[in-house]
């Protein structure tokens, strides 16, 4: 009886550890009401170029709800607008651009961009995005961690679009992805025409880096479970 209870306890612990190991880190964006969220999701060129992409949000029931879906257009740029959500799929560049304008407090939550392929499960393209919308104005800092003091008069500036106001994490993969995002944004000014040649390699490295930690975590948890199981069997063997 004791061995059966211990076995069930070990199994529950094993399942919990597996779920924790397979969870992806989040990208956090902190915006004020009325600002615009911009997210660039890398797509593997030649693999998912012609696949439909979607922007989803986690609802209160714990399930992701599809907010907008792109059309399947072979080799061409696809643009879709659903309310204040804009999706731009650029197959040649291997990038899905997501834009949400005039964000409000109720827009706060967890989002993700995926390959949309029902009835199959969607394929996550990028880190889940955690959006936090505050009620601060555009001229007020969204966080109290970096206060500024000034004795001179201040000038109120018109609202601006904030594309990437989040705290960077010390991860190599995220640094590469963020570099690609900032580089793409900085080259989006009118009159500039630049061809990116290494997008495929970066997106492939991103996918490998997403899968490799989950596999390593699963293998490590399996090894722990096997050792615990052997020790349990030996302790109850007469």
Curated annotation (Swiss-Prot):
Keywords: Adaptive immunity, Cell membrane, Disulfide bond, Glycoprotein, Immunity, Immunoglobulin domain, Innate immunity, Membrane, Receptor, Signal, Transmembrane, Transmembrane helix. Disulfide bonds join 41-113. Residues 232-238 are cytoplasmic. Residues 1-20 form the signal peptide. One of its GO terms (molecular function) is scaffold protein binding. Residues 21-129 form the Ig-like V-type domain. The keyword Glycoprotein applies. The chain crosses the membrane at residues 211-231. One of its GO terms (cellular component) is plasma membrane. This is Triggering receptor expressed on myeloid cells 1. It comes from Sus scrofa.
